Amino acid sequence: MTNITALLLKHQQKFPHGIWLILSLFILGFASNGQPVQAKTPGQTQPVSAAVKESQMSLRQRLRQSRTANGVSQSIPTGVTLPSNTPTELRNLLTQMDRAASQGDIKGVMQLYGPNFTHGDGLNAQSLEKSLLALWKRYPQLRYSTQLQSWKAEGNVIVAETVTNITGLPSANSNNLALNATITSRQRIQGGKIVNQTILSERSLITSGNKPPQININLPQQVRVGQEYTFDAIVQEPLGDDFLLGTAIEEPVEVSKYLNPTSVDLELLTSGGLFKVGRAPSTPGNRWVSAVILRGGGMTMVTQRLQVVR
């Protein structure tokens, strides 16, 4: 079996210095600490992940924190889109959240969450704060934009669905990685504070290099327990003489995975992308499904949430 490390060293000119730095140190992405799961080609039905253990890299600090809020830099204005009939309580909360997060004011953000805050992924107020601080430290320049999709009153509770877009430009702190994420979530608000949050959908894109691969992802948003599904990450541009390395990762959504690193293995891809077949677990829950693809011009990592229902 070809040794990928030796192969890369032999053709080092195809991988710029920045890419080598990323491979040598870590990739900041929506990734986490989990045991490798099996990856198979179409026709096989095991969970998605790396197939060949040849070249390791760490994916650190899953930016899943961004789904729960609100990391932005004070130098970039935020944008909140609110319907005209938005209740004052909800309007004030979203406006204050934007202002505090824009300033990197963790106390200002956390005071908008109830002390007994709960989250569909198992977060509480303490773990949320820790996640936000890690996110802001690594990505100090994020553009944050929230749209209120809908709201309704349930007694003294407001239930609001929002779409959050987060865009981060490359910086030294982020190892020159660019971030673009979209998170749809449902919040329960009581007494002007968020008491519960559930992620409905999420998708993130992280890129590095002067010409990262352009990737189309095919993955269902929801599958039933035990159902077979396909996961394709297709590179759009011609490869030319470039090597293409990549892997797929599939892991459960858990609190422990928000901050801890994951080691994954890259495989040499013989086709223009990743083409995997997986089977949903036998119990309901949420999964993170990611594709990492590396070529001479840069790196792209795409992560999407997969809901497993009965």
Where are these regions (language model features)?
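Surface-exposed, charged secondary-structure patches
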Residues: 133-177, 181
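Aromatic sugar-binding surface patches on proteins
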Residues: 267-276
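Low-complexity, intrinsically disordered terminal/linker segments enriched in charged
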Residues: 195-249
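Short beta-strand edge/turn micro-motifs at domain boundaries
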Residues: 40, 45, 177-213
